[in-house]
């Protein structure tokens, strides 16, 4: 056991296949260079703190229950009993759909293992973090957790080990945060309800999505930005068909395309959250500045190969 341990877990974007992945198709997800830092200290009683602006405040809401429950499960898994102080520091925008809840779960598990000198495997971290995600989202696919644990770009099918996609070039994507809050579990239920109205159509779209994941994977590896953009536009149309768009995200997608992006789409659950877009690298900075002028949080992200990491200071 150590005085303090730290773990940093990246957030994520879904490049293609969200919602379809819940129903057996594949998705492509990527870690991003924004994430969650968790610090673990010994304490006289269990405490959870999180950053709000420049202050760290103790959280006493229902939102901390999954963290407390996850801490208990992780301690049981490693065979330890010790009250802990958990301090969460995030540079992922609130309610952005960029995987903050998954990253919190992943970083918490990893930091606890480091604190007690237990070498948790990636699979251990994934399984424990998923138990926390299920308490929040009900029936998550696991793709958010996998992206945070393993890093890089991954091809993911529910119930299978993720496959990492290795790219020679550095891909940079634009992220725009809509500011619209939504609940992932409700959107998953909405998608499931609408798809049940036309099961044959959904089955055809599910099969098409699985094939197009291969096309997107090839486009990412070959750095074919125009093809990546075209496939993004297709997937966004699918999500819109199932009622997962929002007037604000639609406006942001139209704006990004008008500024010269090859493609743009909702990322994650939809209904708000964030939009991702792709453009030539020399245009990215100008596009993000122009969108920020409209009052939206907008930034570019890189896709780090490294997933969760932990250390002691």
Label every model-predicted segment.
Residues 19, 52-54, 90-92, 270:
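Short, histidine-centered active-site or binding-site loop motifs used for metal coordination
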Residues 73-96, 128:
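Glycine- and acidic-rich phosphate- and metal-coordinating loops
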Residues 28, 92, 98, 156, ...:
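Short clusters of hydrophobic/aromatic residues that line enzyme substrate/ligand-binding pockets
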Residues 98-121:
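DPxDG-like acidic metal-binding loop motif
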């Amino acid at each position: 056991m150590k005085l303090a341990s730290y773990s940093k877990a990246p957030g994520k974007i879904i490049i293609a296949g969200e919602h379809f992945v819940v129903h057996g198709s594949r998705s492509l997800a990527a870690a991003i260079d924004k994430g969650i830092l968790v610090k673990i200290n010994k304490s006289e009683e269990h405490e959870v703190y999180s950053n709000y602006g420049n202050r760290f405040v103790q959280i006493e809401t229902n939102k901390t229950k999954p963290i407390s429950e996850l801490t208990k499960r992780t301690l049981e898994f490693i065979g330890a009993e010790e009250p802990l102080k958990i301090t969460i520091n995030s540079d992922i925008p609130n309610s952005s759909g960029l995987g903050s809840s998954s990253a919190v779960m992943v970083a918490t598990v990893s930091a606890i293992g480091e604190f007690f000198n237990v070498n948790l495997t990636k699979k251990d971290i994934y399984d424990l973090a998923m138990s926390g995600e299920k308490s929040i989202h009900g029936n998550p696919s696991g793709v958010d957790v996998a992206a945070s644990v393993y890093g890089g770009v991954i091809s993911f099918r529910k119930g299978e080990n993720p496959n990492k996609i290795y790219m020679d070039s550095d891909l940079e994507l634009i992220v725009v945060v809509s500011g619209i809050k939504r609940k992932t579990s409700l959107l998953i239920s909405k998608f499931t309800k609408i798809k049940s109205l036309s099961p044959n159509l959904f089955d055809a779209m599910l099969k098409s999505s699985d094939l197009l994941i291969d096309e997107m994977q090839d486009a990412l590896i070959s750095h074919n930005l125009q093809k990546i953009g075209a496939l993004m536009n297709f997937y966004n149309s699918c999500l819109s068909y199932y009622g997962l768009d929002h007037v604000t995200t639609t406006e942001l997608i139209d704006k990004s395309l008008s500024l010269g992006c090859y493609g743009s789409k909702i990322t994650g659950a939809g209904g708000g959250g964030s939009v991702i877009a792709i453009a030539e690298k020399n245009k990215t900075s100008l596009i993000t500045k122009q969108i920020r002028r409209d009052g939206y949080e907008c930034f570019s992200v890189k896709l780090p190969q490294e997933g969760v990491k932990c250390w002691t200071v």
